[in-house]
C-alpha cells in the first residue's frame, strides 16, 4: 500500500488537541501506512504528544497555525478572516497536494464554505453535500445525504446527491446496483414538495440509478434502501433526532440493574439483560459512525461532530482513509459524466 497522508485540524471541535491528538495516535497505531499532518498551536500539540511512542511520532508532522475558527462564528465572517487558521491551513494541505484528505471537528458552515472555495466542486455539482453511512436493523448500512450542507435543495441538487450516494454505496459498501430512495412525507407519487417530485421523475428516467421511490423518516434504520436522499434541513434534523434517541436508549440500558433496593437476583438479571441488549444494539452508537464526508468536491473532506470523543474522532479519520483509498471524488466525477445531462 502506498503512503497515505491526511491533514488534521487539531484545534477544531469542543475539545481540540485533548481529543484530536490522542485520536490521531490511535489511528496511526491501527494503520502503519498512515501519516498525519497536525495543524494548530505547536506548543499545545507538542505537549499533548509528550508521552507518545516515538515510532508513531515519526509519522506525525506539526504545521503551525496562528488561530482557530470559533465554533459559534458566522460562516461568512469566519471565511473572510480565515487566513492563518488551523482549518484553512489543513484544507490548503489538500489543495496543494501535501495531503489527500482533511478532517475537522470545527465550525460546520466555515468548513463547507472554505472547502468549496479552496477545493472547488466537481463538474456537474452545484453544491457539495454532507454524507454519512448509518447502520440499520438488518445489520447492513445505508448511505444518507444531505445532512446539513444545504438547507434548501432543488430537484437538480437532489439528483446529484442521489448519484453521489450511489457511488459511495458501490465503492464503500460493495453493493452492486444500490437501491436509491428519496425521503418524503408519504410513498404516494402525489405527495411532497415540487422539488422532490421533480427529482423523482428524473431519477426514474435514469437507467444508471436504481430508484425505488419514496420512503418516510421511520424507514431510516429499516434497511429498505441502500441510499437515502433528502435536503440538508430534513437530513440534519433526522440524523440528530435519531442520535438523541439512540443515546437515550443506550443510557437507559446502562442504568438498568443499578438500583440498590432491588433483590440481588433482580440486579444480576438486569446486568445480564443489559449486556445482551448492549451487544445487540451497540452498533447503533453514534460514536461508531462519526464523520460526515463532504461529497462533490475535488478532494476529500470529513466533518467530525464538534463534541466527538477520542473514539469517535478516530472513526472520522478512518472514514477519510477509506474515502481516499476508494477514490470517491474521482469515481463520482466519472459517474456524473455518465448520468447527468450535458450542458451546452
Swiss-Prot record:
Its main location: cytoplasm. One of its GO terms (cellular component) is cytoplasm. Its EC number is 2.3.1.274. It is an enzyme of class 2 (transferase). It catalyses: a fatty acyl-[ACP] + phosphate = an acyl phosphate + holo-[ACP]. InterPro entries: FA_synthesis, Phospholipid_synth_PlsX-like. It is found in: Cytoplasm. Keywords: Cytoplasm, Lipid biosynthesis, Lipid metabolism, Phospholipid biosynthesis, Phospholipid metabolism, Transferase. This is Phosphate acyltransferase.
Amino acid at each position: 500500500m502506498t503512503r497515505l497522508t491526511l491533514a488534521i485540524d487539531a484545534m477544531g471541535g469542543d475539545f481540540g488537541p485533548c481529543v484530536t491528538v490522542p485520536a490521531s495516535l490511535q489511528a496511526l497505531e491501527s494503520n502503519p501506512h498512515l501519516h498525519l499532518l497536525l495543524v494548530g498551536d505547536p506548543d499545545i500539540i507538542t505537549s499533548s504528544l509528550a508521552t507518545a511512542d516515538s515510532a508513531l511520532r515519526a509519522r506525525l508532522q506539526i504545521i503551525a497555525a496562528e488561530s482557530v475558527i470559533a465554533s459559534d462564528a458566522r460562516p461568512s465572517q469566519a471565511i473572510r478572516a480565515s487566513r492563518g487558521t488551523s482549518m484553512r491551513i489543513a484544507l490548503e494541505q489538500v489543495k496543494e497536494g501535501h495531503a489527500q484528505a482533511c478532517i475537522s471537528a470545527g465550525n460546520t458552515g466555515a468548513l463547507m464554505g472554505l472547502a468549496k472555495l479552496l477545493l472547488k466542486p466537481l463538474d456537474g455539482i452545484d453544491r457539495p453535500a454532507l454524507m454519512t453511512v448509518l447502520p440499520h436493523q438488518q445489520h447492513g448500512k445505508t448511505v444518507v445525504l444531505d445532512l446539513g450542507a444545504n438547507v434548501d435543495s432543488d430537484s437538480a441538487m437532489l439528483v446529484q446527491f442521489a448519484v453521489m450516494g450511489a457511488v459511495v454505496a458501490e465503492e464503500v459498501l460493495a453493493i452492486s446496483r444500490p437501491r436509491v430512495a428519496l425521503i418524503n412525507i408519504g410513498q404516494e407519487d402525489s405527495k411532497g414538495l415540487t422539488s422532490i417530485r421533480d427529482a423523482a421523475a428524473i431519477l426514474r428516467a435514469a437507467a444508471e440509478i436504481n430508484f425505488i421511490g419514496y420512503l418516510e423518516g421511520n424507514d431510516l434504520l429499516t434497511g429498505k434502501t441502500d441510499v437515502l436522499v433528502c435536503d440538508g434541513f430534513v437530513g440534519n434534523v433526522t440524523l440528530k433526532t435519531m442520535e438523541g434517541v439512540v443515546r437515550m436508549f443506550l443510557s437507559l440500558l446502562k442504568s438498568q440493574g443499578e438500583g440498590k433496593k432491588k433483590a440481588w437476583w433482580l440486579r444480576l438479571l438486569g446486568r445480564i439483560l443489559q449486556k445482551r441488549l448492549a451487544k445487540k444494539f451497540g452498533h447503533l452508537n453514534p460514536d461508531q459512525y462519526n464523520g460526515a464526508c463532504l461529497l462533490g468536491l475535488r478532494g476529500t473532506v470529513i466533518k467530525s461532530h464538534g463534541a466527538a470523543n477520542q473514539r469517535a474522532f478516530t472513526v472520522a479519520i478512518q472514514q477519510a482513509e477509506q474515502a481516499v483509498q476508494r477514490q470517491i471524488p474521482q469515481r463520482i466525477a466519472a459517474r456524473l459524466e455518465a448520468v447527468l445531462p450535458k450542458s451546452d
